[in-house]
Each structure stands twice: as structure tokens, then as C-alpha cells.
Amino acid sequence: MTMTGADARVILVANQKGGVGKSTTVAAVAEMIAAAGKRGRRVLVVDGDPQANVTVEDLGVQGDRGQSLAQTLQFNAPLVPVRNVRANLDVIAGGPQLAVVGAGAHLMVDNGIDMAANLEHQLGVLSAAEGYDLVLIDSGPGDVPLLDTYLAVANYLLIPTRDDQASLGGVERLARRFWRARQLGASIQLLGVLLFDVNPRATKRNQDVFDQVAEMLEGSGTTPFDITIRSAPAAAVDMRTLHKTAGELVALADDDRRARLSKLRHHQSPERAMWTSDPTGLAADYQELVRQIVARLARYESARYGERVG
């Protein structure tokens, strides 16, 4: 099965706790898949969060404050993407208009409006027209009606989490929404849980968290991702300040290093444009995550369709 057109996979990235790396993960994975190889893949990011972090902070896009997505959810209006924010990468912007939708969700249900059906229909139309291979939905932590809508639409769920109990509590709450969506007929599958912002040398602590997560996921047919995303505070500041992903920081760090060396050779005071000096390890973490995501998609879809993912 090839990753094209109406066959675009829809991956929801969610956790019912904020600050666990959802938006950062969406941006990093989307950019790497879109840029991979000579042609890359066509990727659409749907920022389903009223805070719009992946739109504004991670990708540096000035969107429509969530207006297009809100109109789709409420009125089945066509989705209007911000095109070519990176090569092969489009964005449906998030923003505060989505908070209005979430607050009025019960009224829409009373009036027979099916937000999930509207979004699923318009995503299918847009994916077929634009030839998207992958759709990544970034979900906010607190708006349950919106979260339930995305769970009903997505094919797969990826859950980033930190190793603290509050974040793991968010995983547990989301797991309950996931199972509820499945009971209501959603076809969504759990792709895996990603441990984010951790010390890779804290192997005992990380294994303890893996064990807790595995217990939460029992019966889901999947396990946590083997890769963890390392803690990199300086790179995190640079990514949000410069609106770049971990992969994009690597080239910028090289340019920054060369510029500072050139100024030193000319006896000038170098100005540091970035806080991080070497983001290659962080970028490698995300590259391995992308590899594992593609491998899991291939395994799931081979079992479902008897074919390999192309």
C-alpha cells in the first residue's frame, strides 16, 4: 500500500497533560518526513489546539487563529491550509477560534452536528486533492470534545509524555478516552507512547517509566517506543525562538559556528545566535523516532491489508 492521496494516514499526537512535547514532536516528525529523501512525502499538520503552539511557535506560521478548522468542524466547510510552510509541508492553523467550538460542542450535538464526520470528510477531500501521504493532528490537553473528535477521525494515536506522575496521569486519562472511542466504533489504533525530555543515562528510572506505561497499555497490542527524546534545554529555547525543528537546528548550528569562528579570525567579538552548540544528538533521536513510526505503520498495515507500506 502506497502513502498517497486518499490513503493518507492520520496520526493524532495527544496527552491530557500539557507541556509534554506534543507540538514539538508533531513539528519535528512532520518536517523530517516531508524532507526525507529526494522527494520526501507530502505531509499535512492539523493544529487542533486553541493555543496554536505548533503553528506559531514551532513552525513560525501566522495562521487564521483556527478559523478554517473551526468552520470545518461546525459547518463542514472546506479546510484551507497554509501551503508550503516547508517543502512538502502544509498546515491547518490552530488558534482561539477552536476554544469557541469546544465550548459550544454540546449545542452542536443537540442540533445534529457531527464534528467528527465533518472533519473526516473534509480531510479526505483535501488529502485526495493535495496528495498528502501523512496527516499529523496536534491536540490540546484540556478540551475533551475536541479530543474526542480527533480520536474518532484518526487512524493512529501517538502519546508523548514526560516521566513525572502528572504527565503519566495524563497518559492514563487519555487511555480511557481512547478505549471509549474504540467502544463507540472508532478504528483508531495505539501507535505507541514516547518518553520525552528525559536523561538517556537514567536507565533505571526510564525503565521504571516504561514499565508503568506498558501496564497502562496492556491489551492495546503495542508497547512504548524504544527511543526516548533527550532533555536538551538550550535546543528547546532555540527551537521556539527561531521557529525551527530539531532537524533544522543542525544546519543553523553549523552556520552559527562558522560565523563565530570567522569573527574570531578577524579579531571581532562573536555574537552567539543560538544557545545550543550541537543539536545533532537531539535530531538523531527524532530521526530514530521517525524510523520507528514508519516501521510500526508498516507492521500494522501489513497485518491489516497483507501489504507493505510504500
Spans of model-derived segments:
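P-loop NTP-binding core
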Residues: 1-310
